[in-house]
Amino acid sequence: MAEIRLQHLAHSYSKTPSGPEDYAIREMDHIWEQGGAYALLGPSGCGKSTLLNIISGLLSPSQGHVLFDGKAVNDLTPEKRNIAQVFQFPVVYDTMTVFDNLAFPLRNQGLAEAKVHSKVQEIAEVLDLQNLLSKKARNLTADEKQKVSMGRGLVRDDVSAILFDEPLTVIDPYLKWKLRRKLKQIHEQFNITMVYVTHDQLEASTFADKIAVMYGGQIVQFGTPRELFERPSHTFVGYFIGSPGMNLIEVQPQPGGVGFNSTHLPLSDGLQRHIEHGQWKNLKVGIRPEFIHVWDEPFDDAMQARVVHVEDLGTYKIMTLDLDGAPLKVRLAEDKPVPQGTAYISFPAQWLMVYADEFLLDATDSEVQP
């Protein structure tokens, strides 16, 4: 098990990068603590697999350092880093039995056959592979092959971390759920550092204790699933996490707050000072569809919005509204009345986020939160 630390790490596939747009990984510092279950979440092309390959040693970074337990490993080959990597498509030795696949890394280390047999049996039991040990790998299903790939990483006692690169992409949805649960059980049992790469927020939130969200070659937020949902540090996190994603409205500074068209949104004194003293290129407000209050008749200072569309999804409804020219999504509980034609809404102050140049403004801090 290892703490994985990235120091001033950056990577470009270009030999002569001329700007940030030429970098697959923009300069970053990050720590994955020993024994944690982490997810690296983001859309295709954001740099997830590149970062994973740098950690495992399959790729050398253009700059910066990778440290395991405080020791730089940039010059170490993948096998000397003691990293196990499970890829999107299962990698097994088709002509070998499941037993021999699992035993392969142990025999390469020269372990006694009695120890090999004991360890293979232990891992086979954990992964429910006992009845398949004598079966040739070529005859396995996709999920069985992926479990064998995972088992080869778990079978070694000296593995520093296991890296999963979208390992469930080719697995049926029901089996995905079973394997995610199995991975969680394995982590709790072995307490090994695991980093799970995915573009699926459900996979990330059900596996990981903490999620690193990547966008444009950067980790734009690192936190628990709840933190990412309730307080996104970047507009991309707000949009990407949740279904539907966060509502984002471009606004302009106004006395006492911000506004758009004829709508005014009051803000705290701290946020107002931030906005007044900053040189921002753009300002946005964001609020989750779940956090918008809705009434079907005028209520206090509620804003009036036009109901454009209502989608009934069984256990909840999604309303599309037009608020002074800005489209909004609102999530309504199944038992809540649906306004007809006109809705009256409010944005609770604790759930209304303000973003300057796409990053969250925090009234308690003196600068934008990166």
Predicted regions, residues:
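Non-catalytic connector elements of ABC transporters
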Residues: 255-370
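Short beta-strand immediately N-terminal to the Walker A/P-loop
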Residues: 38-39, 85
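Conserved ABC transporter NBD signature motif
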Residues: 64-72
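ABC ATPase nucleotide-binding domains
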Residues: 82, 88, 92-236
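Helix-to-loop junction immediately C-terminal to a conserved catalytic motif
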Residues: 56
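ABC ATPase nucleotide-binding domain helices that frame the ATP-binding cleft
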Residues: 49-52, 148-150
